[in-house]
From Swiss-Prot:
Name of the protein in question: Leucine--tRNA ligase
Chief location category: cytoplasm
PANTHER family per UniProt: LEUCINE--TRNA LIGASE, MITOCHONDRIAL, LEUCYL-TRNA SYNTHETASE
Binding of ATP, residues: 627
Entry's EC annotation: 6.1.1.4
One biological process term in Gene Ontology: leucyl-tRNA aminoacylation
Motif 'KMSKS' region boundaries: 624-628
Record field: catalytic activity: tRNA(Leu) + L-leucine + ATP = L-leucyl-tRNA(Leu) + AMP + diphosphate
One example GO MF annotation: ATP binding
Cysteines joined through disulfide linkages: none
Length: 864
């Protein structure tokens, strides 16, 4: 072996052995417990970032540790390969999205392989391949048969210049991101999946999951089960009687209603706008806004009075109807009751437009004011009804019951459970996605593609130009025959939401070569024992994948109803930011690698200059690594300079997996230095470490016993930390081990070999290359087999036994020394040894002991 640690050589050698042995190809094995661990599959954007490195290293460490502990472990990988970024890149570069995607996959796969990840590449999938998305289409048709998939009109963002539908993130300040045109809302037919049919189960099954509480709460809030009252305000228009329906969780405030607001798309708004240009103009303005709930939450709340009133169902008083830009047709009934006295948004709206504000609940001892909103105005915990006639004095629950009963008696409504969750719209008016398997026949209508004709293959040679969906212009794709009548027909040009692709890929990993969607192997591996990904996926991806899994179960495809038993949401990777700001306020961000930082005597940054010109830059603080802030670290540069093991070691040591990781160049250098020490010890002591002589543990000398005691004590802690996924303290334990071994004076070669072998196995899951090569070079592989399959070291409990123990010696409560006594010494023997110790003679001033306090195994305190 080389004297010097050369990461590139070490890692190339280890990876060569792993490839030759096909070391990570995994098969089902009923004789072993299984452990299926999956990192959320990446989008092939071009290059890995440090967030990827951290995620996959966590997965890899888990895999290797559990494989050493006898588990049949599986770590697969794939590519979430459809999506809008590929179309954008295609437009920018004039190449088909397919070429851009496959080139990126090739590069990123090479990066993963250079990290030494234990991936079974025989299971690799790419969601843009027909053999994968065929099953998206197949299950969609099954859901169509069962009524889970259905078609209805939905609202989208329409760019009138580019003549295309825009995703919410492509609408910037109400304008199309490419054309700059004012975006319009349009109603178009789309396909939906009835996720609401599973709302109760999705909510209730959260209790049995080993997921972070934060994620569970986010899903609970998104599902949003609400108990309230659905009722209507009666009105008459053009001789027709009807109800303007609303849903409220605050029926106790119903007598505080001073207006109603409806969405711009509400049928009543459409009717009232006829012949009224000012109303129609406002409706058109609303339709130009984004359709995302987040957009509505942050936009300025605007409204216009219709001049029309409905009647209050309990008092008969007129209630003015407004059209509001903050009311979404897709949520609730598309109408809301306005109670400005007890709702902050309604309060602001009423103040803006001079609408009446009525107080109908009050808390004792609190004064109501119209000057500004106060949090307690909507309090339902302590408030009671006031100014509400027969309901006065009732608390929230009793008031809701009474109001609901009266509304029901009048035929206006009743109690209702509602959900914030809405059915999942899966139609996307985009090219680079799974084609929806529907054919439009002029005679037969919408006809599902027959199962034997799947997949409907997406042409991969089209180049989007931003003016509509390329599929609509592709005669070869578009034109077909109706499966029912044989007449000329057209294919559906919408593609599926890319969340469909990522809703079941983990099941396909288990049977990637199956000629069915899944097979018996899926029930062996699934559900995932551990899923790893960012908190940003807490709602949509994780909720949709839970729904998709339940549908697959109900169709008899699988036996499980949840995709993942446990979830780990790794923390973000942070780094320093630096910028300069020009006269217009525009900021230019500089990568930390291009900046020199000065620090004060306490190590705090106090200034920074750009390396190219020596001029100052502003310290922008520590933020998440991102392209926008130019504060990322290229993993490939790191691997090329220090090696993959250093990158892995630093990302595991710098912080616990679930916490944020702050990047540190000094920390990376420290990780590299530690690995050089591990290697150097092995190289320097290779003759001693190659000694295979056995030993009698009972006959060992003090130095050997002390070293073994230290190593096995630390091993016990490291094992515990591996089990609780605290890999940072595992690395700390390994550092303690190396210090103990390196500093052991008088230890015999046989014990050095034993303890160094323990160190290599403890470190192996984190830094597999250097430990694998040392294990082989020092002869451990000849004795125990390759480190890949070496068993996890067992703690020698006998080595932890001590003939003597050390107690703290105190005199009058102050530490004055240490006292060594036999482990099984009696209290009397301990007291005698304490008063005989020279420390007592020195600090007692010749006074006799009045009292001796013995805390077994810890200390002796002599009171004089």
């Amino acid at each position: 072996m080389h004297e010097r640690y050369v990461p590139a050589d070490v890692e190339a050698a280890a990876q060569g052995d792993w490839r030759a042995a096909d070391a990570y190809k995994t098969r089902e094995d009923s004789q072993k417990p299984k452990f299926y661990c999956v990192s959320m599959l990446p989008y092939p954007s071009g290059k890995l970032h440090m967030g990827h490195v951290r995620n996959y290293t966590i997965n890899d460490v888990m895999y290797r540790y559990l494989r050493m502990n006898g588990y049949n472990t599986l770590m697969p990988m794939g590519w979430d390969a459809f999506g809008m970024p590929a179309e954008n890149a295609a437009m920018a570069n004039g190449v088909p999205p397919a070429k851009w995607t496959y080139d990126n996959i090739d590069y990123m796969k090479g990066q993963m392989q250079s990290m030494g990840l234990a991936i079974d590449w025989s299971r690799e999938i790419a969601t843009c391949k027909p053999d994968y998305y065929k099953w998206n289409q197949w299950l969609f048709l099954k859901m169509l048969e069962k009524g889970i998939a259905y078609k209805k009109t939905g609202t989208v963002n329409w760019d009138p210049v580019d003549q295309t539908v825009l995703a919410n993130e492509q609408v910037i300040d109400g304008r199309g991101w490419r054309s700059g045109a004012l975006v319009e809302k349009r109603e178009i037919p789309m396909y939906y999946l009835r996720i609401t049919q599973y709302a109760d189960e999705l909510l209730n099954d959260l209790d049995g999951l080993g997921w972070p509480e934060r994620v569970k709460i986010m899903q609970q809030n998104w599902i949003g089960k609400s108990f309230g009252v659905n009722f209507g305000f009666p009105y008459e228009l053009d001789g027709e009687k009807a109800l303007l329906r609303v849903f409220t969780t605050r029926a106790d405030t119903i007598l505080g209603v001073t207006f109603c607001a409806v969405a711009a798309e509400h049928p009543l708004a459409t009717r009232l706008a006829q012949g009224k240009p000012e109303l129609q103009a406002f409706i058109d303005e609303c339709k130009r806004g984004g359709v995302a709930e987040a957009d509505v939450a942050t936009m300025e709340k605007k409204g216009v009075a219709t001049g029309f009133s409905v009647s209050h169902p309990l008092t008969g008083e007129p209630v003015e109807v407004w059209i509001g830009n903050y009311v979404l047709m897709s949520y609730g009934e598309g109408a809301v009751m306005g109670v400005p006295g007890h709702d902050e948004r309604d309060f602001a709206f009423a103040k803006k437009y001079g609408l009446p504000i009525k107080q109908v609940i009050a808390s004792e001892g609190q004064t109501y004011s119209l000057d500004a909103w106060q949090e307690w105005y909507g309090d339902k915990e302590t408030a009671v009804c006031v100014n509400s006639g027969k309901y006065d004095g009732l608390r929230y629950a009793d008031a809701v019951d009474a109001v609901a009963a009266d509304l029901k008696a009048g035929g206006y409504g009743d109690k209702q459970v509602t959900w914030r969750l809405r059915d999942w719209g899966v139609s996307r008016q985009r090219y680079w996605g799974t084609p929806i398997p529907i054919i439009h026949c002029p005679s037969c209508g919408d006809v599902p593609v027959p199962e034997q004709d799947l997949p409907v293959v997406l042409p991969e040679d089209l180049v989007p130009d931003g003016s509509g969906n390329p599929l609509a212009k592709s005669e070869a794709f578009l034109n077909c025959s109706c499966p029912k009548c044989g007449a000329a027909a057209k294919r559906e040009t919408d593609t599926m939401d890319t969340f469909v692709d990522s809703s079941w890929y983990f099941s396909r990993y288990t049977a990637p070569d199956a000629d069915t969607m899944v097979d018996a192997r899926t029930d062996y591996w699934m559900p995932m024992d551990q899923y790893i990904g960012g908190i940003e996926h807490a709602i949509l991806h994780l909720l949709y994948s839970r729904f998709w899994t339940k549908v697959m179960r109900d169709l008899g495809l699988v036996k499980f109803g949840e995709p993942a038993k446990n979830l780990l949401t790794q923390g973000m990777v942070l780094n320093e930011t630096f910028y300069r700001e020009d006269a217009s306020g525009k900021k230019t961000w500089y990568n930390p690698a291009d900046v020199t930082v000065t620090h004060d005597d306490k190590g705090r940054p106090v200034g920074a200059t750009l390396n190219t010109d020596g001029q100052p830059v502003v310290l922008g603080g520590i933020e998440k690594m991102s392209k926008s802030k130019n504060n990322g670290v290229d993993p490939q540069v790191l691997i090329d300079q220090y090696g993959a093991d250093t990158a892995r070691l630093f990302t595991m040591f710098a912080a616990p997996p679930e916490q944020q990781l702050e990047w540190s160049g000094a920390g990376v250098e420290g990780a590299s230095r530690f690995l050089r020490r591990v290697w150097s010890f092995g190289a320097t002591n290779r003759e001693a470490l190659a000694t295979r002589a056995g030993f009698d543990a009972a006959a060992l000398g003090d130095a050997d016993k002390a070293l073994r005691r230290e190593i096995y004590s630390v091993l016990k802690q490291a094992d515990f930390d591996y089990q609780r996924l605290q890999y940072n303290t595992v690395v700390s334990a390994a550092m303690k081990m190396l210090n103990a071994i390196d500093g052991a004076k008088g230890a015999t070669p046989a014990v050095l070999r034993e303890t160094y072998g323990v160190l290599l196995r403890v470190l192996y899951p984190v830094v597999p290359h250097v430990t694998f090569e040392l294990w082989k070079a020092l002869g451990y592989a000849d004795e125990f087999g390759p480190l890949l399959d070496a068993p996890w070291p067992k703690v020698d409990e006998a080595a932890l036994e001590q003939a003597e123990i050390e107690l703290v010696l105190q005199v009058n409560g102050k530490v004055r020394g240490a006292l060594k006594v036999a482990k099984d010494a009696s209290r009397e023997a301990i007291e005698a040894a304490a008063v005989a110790d020279e420390a007592f003679a020195k600090f007692s001033d010749g006074k006799p002991a009045k009292k001796i306090v013995v805390v077994p195994g810890r200390l002796v305190n002599i009171v004089v």
